[in-house]
């Protein structure tokens, strides 16, 4: 039986990575022996290239293709084999982040960047079975990022407002897959809500 792919999405500072770390320690989730991963990947040729691009003034198309190459490698080396072995895979960011972020970075280069990037992936990516969208006002996310001293070029107010709008559009277009989480609440509260939704999903599937 094919495994299940669960993804956590949201703008920077939404708290999804904090909850992803909590899920790795949660006994109810650990009982399923899931595979935890993230995008961009870490410690890989493609993932390292993406991280360098994020920290530099890389051309928007070059940046997209680096992210996409990392996604392809991630699918081939980890996600597909795990799913074929019946594993549950939980990924901190996945293809929806590319649609949302590159949908904004490419808006001055393409007429409809969101659909263009989605079309680029459509024939070969794996659509998640369940996606949590950690929704938060960009003003709050920027404040959080500033406190941890990790603000990047993607963490500007107008940019994040656009990214958030695309994330919410993706969720509205696919309500069967997306669960929208109010990410302004405490990580502990959100963890309980996410665990509850995951257990409900797995009991049905």
Swiss-Prot record:
ATP binds at residues 10-17. It catalyses: dTMP + ATP = dTDP + ADP. The keyword ATP-binding applies. Pfam families: Thymidylate_kin. It is an enzyme of class 2 (transferase). Belongs to the thymidylate kinase family. This is Probable thymidylate kinase. It comes from Methanosarcina barkeri (strain Fusaro / DSM 804). The lineage of its organism: Archaea, Methanobacteriati, Methanobacteriota, Stenosarchaea group, Methanomicrobia.
């Amino acid at each position: 039986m094919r495994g299940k792919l669960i993804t956590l999405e949201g703008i920077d500072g939404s708290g999804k990575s904090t909850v992803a770390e909590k899920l790795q320690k949660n006994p109810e989730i650990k009982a399923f022996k899931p595979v935890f991963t993230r995008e961009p990947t870490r410690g890989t040729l493609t993932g390292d290239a993406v991280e360098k691009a994020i920290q530099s003034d890389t051309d928007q198309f070059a940046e997209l293709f680096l992210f996409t190459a990392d996604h392809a490698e991630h699918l081939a080396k980890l996600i597909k084999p795990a799913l074929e072995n019946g594993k549950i895979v939980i990924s901190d960011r996945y293809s929806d982040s590319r649609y949302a972020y590159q949908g904004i970075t490419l808006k001055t280069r393409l007429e409809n960047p969101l659909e263009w990037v989605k079309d680029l992936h459509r024939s070969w990516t794996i659509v998640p079975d369940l996606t949590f969208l950690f929704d938060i006002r960009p003003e709050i996310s920027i404040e959080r990022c500033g406190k941890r001293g990790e603000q990047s070029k993607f963490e500007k107010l107008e940019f994040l407002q656009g990214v958030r709008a695309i994330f919410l559009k993706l969720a509205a277009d696919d309500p069967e897959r997306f669960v929208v989480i109010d990410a302004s609440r405490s990580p502990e509260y959100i963890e309980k809500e996410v665990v509850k939704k995951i257990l409900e999903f797995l009991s049905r599937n």
